[in-house]
C-alpha cells in the first residue's frame, strides 16, 4: 500500500500556505475592528453536542459525520461545523454570567470534517472561519454581522457577490409555516425525491433546501414563509432590511432559503457568487436565539456566520485576484569553503536577531549555484563569505538588483544591518 493522504484531504505546501496566511491575517485584522476575540474549541465533541443542535434529520448528522466510540465507549464525533462547539463552550464556561461583557463576540478558524464527495472547494477535512455574537437581539446585530462579511469580501477584492436574505421567524411562525408546507407537499409526495419523502413529516423545511431537480420543481409554487411571520418577526425582518438599505448593502429576498441546520430562527442569509456559471455559497449564517438554552444555559439571543477557506481561496483564484504574498529575503550568504561555515552561522543568527530574513548555503555548492539560489529566493542582498573574509573580519555585500557593493566589518553587520541596507540603497 502506498502511503498517501486520505481521500478528501490536502497537503497545503509552502508557497500555497502563504496565500492561506495572507487571507487569515486579513480576516483576523477585520474581526478585530468589530471587536471579536478568538476562541479555540476541541476538534472532536460528544456526538450529542452536534446531533441535538444541528438536527437529527439533517444531512450532516444522517450522512456526513465522522463519529466513533472511543476506548471508554464514549460516542465521539469530529466537529462538522463550528457553532455548536462554541455554544457548548459558552454554556460550559458560564460566559453568560453578568460579569462577562455583552454582547460577547467570538470568532474561530479551524478544521471541520464531513464525509461527502470531494470536489473543488469542498473537502472531507475543510477549514472554516466563523463568528458568533451572544447577548443581543437588536436587528442592528444581524446587520452588523452581515456587513462584516460584506466588508471582508470588499477587502479581499472578491467580485459579483450577492446577498440572499430570508427570515424563519419565531418558533411559532415556523411551526405555522411547517404545517402549511406539509399541507402543500403531501398531495405531491410521490413527485419528491426519496430523501424528501422521508423528511416530509420529520422536517419539511429540508425539502426547500434540497438540491434534487424533482424537489426544486415541486417547491417552485410552495407557500412563502414570509406570509406566516407573526407581528414581532415581521418587525424584526423589516428592521434588518431597512438597516441594510441604509448601509447601501444590496440584497435579494430568497424565500426558499432555509439553511442546512435546524437551530436557526429569524434572519438567515447567504453570500453567493458565480464561478464558471455555477452558483457558489461563500458565507452563510443567521440568528439562533434558542441554542444556548438548548445547551442548558439561560435564554440568550445569538447571531453568527461561517465561511469555508478552501472555497474562498478557490474564488480568489478563479477571479484572478492577486494576493500580495511576500516572497523575498533580506540576505543570502554564499559560503565558500568549510572555513566560513561557523562565521556564516554566527552572522546569520546576528542578523536574524535584528529582525531580518536570512538564508545561507549549507551544501558546499559552487558559487554559481549559490547565486542562482539567491535569485530564486528573491534575495535583496548577497554576501559572499570565504576564508579571506573570515581572516579579515570584513565582507562585501551586494545589492542584488543594482549590483552596488559595500565592504563592511563583521561587527557593524552584527549590530547595525539596517544601516548596511541603507548604504546599498535599500
Curated annotation (Swiss-Prot):
Name the Pfam families on file: HGTP_anticodon, tRNA-synt_His
Keyword ATP-binding, does the record have it? Answer: yes
What are its E.C. numbers?
Answer: 6.1.1.21
GO CC annotations on file: cytoplasm
Enumerate the PROSITE patterns for this protein: AA_TRNA_LIGASE_II
| Subunit field text | Homodimer.
The name under which this protein is listed is Histidine--tRNA ligase
Q: Which organism is it from?
A: Streptococcus agalactiae serotype Ia (strain ATCC 27591 / A909 / CDC SS700)
Q: Which gene encodes it?
A: hisS
